[in-house]
Amino acid sequence: MSQLKLEEISSVIEEKIKNFELDCDMAEVGKVVSYADGVAKIYGLNGVMSYEVLEFETGDKGVAANLEEDSVGVIVFGFGNNIKEGTSVKRTKSLMKVPVGDAVVGRVLNALGEPIDGKGEIETNEFSLIEQKAPGIMDRKSVHEPLQTGIKAIDALVPIGRGQRELIIGDKQTGKTTVAIDTIINQKGQNVICIYVAIGQKESTVAQVVRKLEEYGAMEYSVVVNASASDSAAMQYLAPYAGVAMGEYFRDHARHALIIYDDLSKHAVAYREISLILRRPPGREAFPGDVFYIHSRLLERAAKVCDEKGAGSLTALPIVETQAGDVSAYIPTNIISITDGQIFLETDLFYSGIRPAINVGLSVSRVGGAAQIKATKQVSGTLRLDLAQYRELQAFTQFASDLDEASKKQLERGQRMVEVLKQAPYSPLPIEKQVVIIYAGAKGFLDSVSVKKVVDFEERLYPFLEAKYPQVLEEIHIKKALDKDLEAMLKKALEEFKLTYSE
């Protein structure tokens, strides 16, 4: 039996020591002290950052929301059914990010940026933090380009500009989502990426929205971020921030984007739920004190960026649901004060057949007027006042039957203008056609048409113009203003159509 020499043994040991790799993975680990309703209390993570992503040994993830002296309050993304007392948690040392860029366009994602449409993984190397600082004053430019919704009542009376925040507010079932979807459909060919964030909606409602967008070919330039009613409060709270991070990518790359939050009332409720579980002190309507801040920091990220930064824009259309038309409730007043105007939809108008049910008196656009094209300004300059006078006269006629001729004429024209502003859902109208029909109503071309036939008159007018006077629509589209020659041509076209039109 051969004996091993001492030198051989030492050389083998030396070789082993040389090849030994000290692969030590340092991780800061804590333990779950308590877990209830999607919020975990963790002990032992002293160096954790605010809103840092944490990993549970069960595979669940969450973000650190409450940083206390001896513990950390963590919002868990899913329902965390396997998390229990004693479960270990480790830091990732990274804040929450979502995929951004063209790879997400045409997809349906959850609040974490994960695809839920069954079309495979999102292949991108571009990610963005969901919490970003809004552009400062010097990085912004005043709103001056129109963002047309295709809805006559909005584009004429409460115009929206690129980079604006315009609130859509009203009771449930008044057509708020329809206004938003119409606006998305109308962005076709305008090089605007649209992001629809569904917060606390029914899965069936979101599926219907996606179907509508696909039907009108709008999904090609849209992203849907969904945190439905069946998702946890954490997912509903994070969804708008994930959506705006995707929109900011386009804004910062000299492109234009539109984001719709449907709706921020449910977002506030989700945040209230999380805050109460985290034992934060409740305030008015049991909302935490910083509920204003969560919405202001979200909506301030919508902006028109200055030329030096690429002149991109992100326009926001937040939706808020009111209870019995009460716009003076906590969340509605908060968001009205943050936004640059509101479109107020009314139940009474909706049920009386005026759709979209926009209350022209209460709706306002604080900055959009500068973005309106000249042609629309020319034809709708006195429209708001005319409609207000019509409503006043209408109320007066309920008590007095005898009216002078001028008042009767005003009442008749007002009725026709209300008909002109009616519009079927999912049928946005190009701005040049809007200019034509509002001009026809304002200049008295509809005075001899019966009120019931105004919609029919409008439907037959467009094919007539396209066939016989295509240059009228083309010139309004190109010039974006009505000069004397163009107005004369439009008058001639309308007079000729009136002769051929029979009710």
From Swiss-Prot:
The record marks 363 as: Required for activity. Signal peptide: none annotated. Pfam families: ATP-synt_ab, ATP-synt_ab_C, ATP-synt_ab_N. It is an enzyme of class 7 (translocase). It comes from Helicobacter acinonychis (strain Sheeba). This is ATP synthase subunit alpha. GO terms for molecular function: ADP binding; ATP binding; proton-transporting ATP synthase activity, rotational mechanism. Keywords: ATP synthesis, ATP-binding, Cell inner membrane, Cell membrane, CF(1), Hydrogen ion transport, Ion transport, Membrane, Nucleotide-binding, Translocase, Transport. Its EC number is 7.1.2.2. F-type ATPases have 2 components, CF(1) - the catalytic core - and CF(0) - the membrane proton channel. CF(1) has five subunits: alpha(3), beta(3), gamma(1), delta(1), epsilon(1). CF(0) has three main subunits: a(1), b(2) and c(9-12). The alpha and beta chains form an alternating ring which encloses part of the gamma chain. CF(1) is attached to CF(0) by a central stalk formed by the gamma and epsilon chains, while a peripheral stalk is formed by the delta and b chains. Produces ATP from ADP in the presence of a proton gradient across the membrane. The alpha chain is a regulatory subunit.
